[in-house]
Amino acid sequence: MSKMPAKKKSCFQITSVTTAQVATSITEDTESLDDPDESRTEDVSSEIFDVSRATDYGPEEVCERSSSEETLNNVGDAETPGTVSPNLLLDGQLAAAAAAPANGGGVVSARSVSGALASTLAAAATSAPAPGAPGGPQLAGSSAGPVTAAPSQPPTTCSSRFRVIKLDHGSGEPYRRGRWTCMEYYERDSDSSVLTRSGDCIRHSSTFDQTAERDSGLGATGGSVVVVVASMQGAHGPESGTDSSLTAVSQLPPSEKMSQPTPAQPQSFSVGQPQPPPPPVGGAVAQSSAPLPPFPGAATGPQPMMAAAQPSQPQGAGPGGQTLPPTNVTLAQPAMSLPPQPGPAVGAPAAQQPQQFAYPQPQIPPGHLLPVQPSGQSEYLQQHVAGLQPPSPAQPSSTGAAASPATAATLPVGTGQNASSVGAQLMGASSQPSEAMAPRTGPAQGGQVAPCQPTGVPPATVGGVVQPCLGPAGAGQPQSVPPPQMGGSGPLSAVPGGPHAVVPGVPNVPAAVPAPSVPSVSTTSVTMPNVPAPLAQSQQLSSHTPVSRSSSIIQHVGLPLAPGTHSAPTSLPQSDLSQFQTQTQPLVGQVDDTRRKSEPLPQPPLSLIAENKPVVKPPVADSLANPLQLTPMNSLATSVFSIAIPVDGDEDRNPSTAFYQAFHLNTLKESKSLWDSASGGGVVAIDNKIEQAMDLVKSHLMYAVREEVEVLKEQIKELVERNSLLERENALLKSLSSNDQLSQLPTQQANPGSTSQQQAVIAQPPQPTQPPQQPNVSSA
């Protein structure tokens, strides 16, 4: 089915080639290349596949991307993680997967794509809810918002991305039936636009993380992360939401680029965050706000919302001014996503991170600013913040709005140093965007961090991630904790894990601010944490484990997404792999539903699997498992995984499965380094596919040429015969004609029509002339 193009750079990617027969083509591309019949089966199957896919994905089909593939290829590149067809995720399946609990919406493809992201974010947000049960439910509504975010997604514009060309050749050529999808492969820069494949979407929730992961591996994704969030805010302000998502998207890219690797992760959690929003109520709000931070953009747009919601969660307010009421809450969530970004920030990304945020920030300004996290961003934030800050005011109190936002930021901060800066930034941003760090402190102060810490355990794990979860519990305590966090935070930020911790903090942040909110916050934190955790994880593999833990917590939270994320982190080392894994996992969940989609999904898994195959399974099981616990994912994952990998029979029908298998096999065989296998296997598969495609083209051309030649030969034959006939007639006429007539010919030609006879004669002469021409033709 779809192979992941191993090479990002190649312009030509075969998104999906399905073989009805088996995955043979997939497993052994070479074979299929050689064997036309196979191709044919493939074609048929692909058609079916496509169709189903289309149905599944609906429009997304187009986008369907190969995000996973991309991811694979991206490895370094993180080309396009972004995918997301938010809609897809909508499937719900995803959502479920993501946060099943959460709310299906979560599904949203958080995909890495920022655009998608946005939507996903939303979705994620949706899913996040799980974490805050309260939030969760709300989440659902939230998700709707998120969906809205999708619009931002447009950036992704999957549709434009692919063109499906159906070759129907009259001849019975085996290849004839194939359905080819040409996807323009955008380079990473297009990241945001990266096509997202529904599959991605599917994955996205989990993908989210994985994306993040993947991204982190790739780095690209980072940005995506948050976007969604904003969207999720949708409710709050759809606009804001939307904007945020957009922002997120846009911002995404930069971060992606920069921190690429991490970024993605952030994304993931972002997703998780979102759900919290629902809680806006206060607690919920907090949550959301927590998330918000991450999502600066979201926050921003939503921010207002956030503010509204936040009020309940002052902290939320912090970020955006969450003060606003709960409405903002939702927003807050968005903020959540931000954190993810921070993740990316984690690395150097910080700078870039800012970018990511930057976009959103604007929206965010208020609280989200914090998200801006990156210093650059932070400055940006600063500005925003300034703007925001005003709103922040409420926050100020909290920690200074800035602080509070910062807190949110913290989340991001947690993400990585970048994140931390982000967080700080956020915090700072609001407060002192310029100084991400300082903000960080703020965040610490936000206590968000503390929350994470509260988790205490988690902190260890993720530093904050888990904490976050705990955070909620200890929302209040978080506050106390924060200092540590703070202290740690700074360091944390330096350390990926730390950042993560921070991230968790983020959620806390809100908590801190709204101390009262705290509880909510805690929830938020929980969610956030997840996210962060994953982030952290991704950043630091080591955290990874914690992440897992975190994940579970998160899971509870509904971080499902996060789980995925954390999963990614887990992989982190494998980073991509794990991401894939994560994706896979989630995907898996989705897989069922999206088996077709899965196809794409599978890809990531494939790579995942490839390197991680074993790992994947276990890891997936493990890390994902927790997260997966979300039932949907879990079971799906299990089924998918097992199916995917093991399942053969399915292959036919489910390319994805086949793909998994094939890829899996290849990967296993190759199973060099994660990436090696991923890229290696992917490359091989892609090369094979390309070869196959070239052969196909060659054969088509050959047929066409032969047909043309035959036609031309026949025509020449006819012309020659006609020419000879005319010559004979001409000779006959000449012999019969009198000299007078012949002498008149020239004149007649000059003045034809003088006599019918002459005309006849004249007519004849031209014929003679013609013959020569004809001969020429024939000779030609």
UniProtKB/Swiss-Prot annotation:
Start-end of Acidic residues biased regions: 28-37
Compositionally biased residues, Pro residues: 765-774
Biological processes annotated in GO: negative regulation of cell cycle; regulation of transcription by RNA polymerase II; response to osmotic stress
InterPro entries according to UniProt: TSC22/Bun, TSC22/BUN_CS, TSC22_domain_protein_2
Name of a matching Pfam family: TSC22
Comp. bias (Polar residues): 241-262, 415-434, 736-756
Region Disordered: start-end pairs: 20-86, 126-158, 235-499, 587-607, 736-780
Superkingdom classification of source: Eukaryota
Low complexity: bias regions: 126-146, 297-316, 344-361, 395-412, 453-468
Subunit structure and binding partners: Interacts with NRBP1. Interacts with PKM isoform M2; the interaction results in reduced nuclear levels of PKM isoform M2, leading to repression of cyclin CCND1 transcription and reduced cell growth. Interacts with WDR77.
Task performed by this protein: Reduces the level of nuclear PKM isoform M2 which results in repression of cyclin CCND1 transcription and reduced cell growth.
Note: May be involved in the loss of cell cycle regulation in colorectal tumors, expression is shown to be decreased in the majority of tumors.
Family in the record: Belongs to the TSC-22/Dip/Bun family.
Name this polypeptide is given: TSC22 domain family protein 2
Organism: Homo sapiens
Gene expressing this chain: TSC22D2
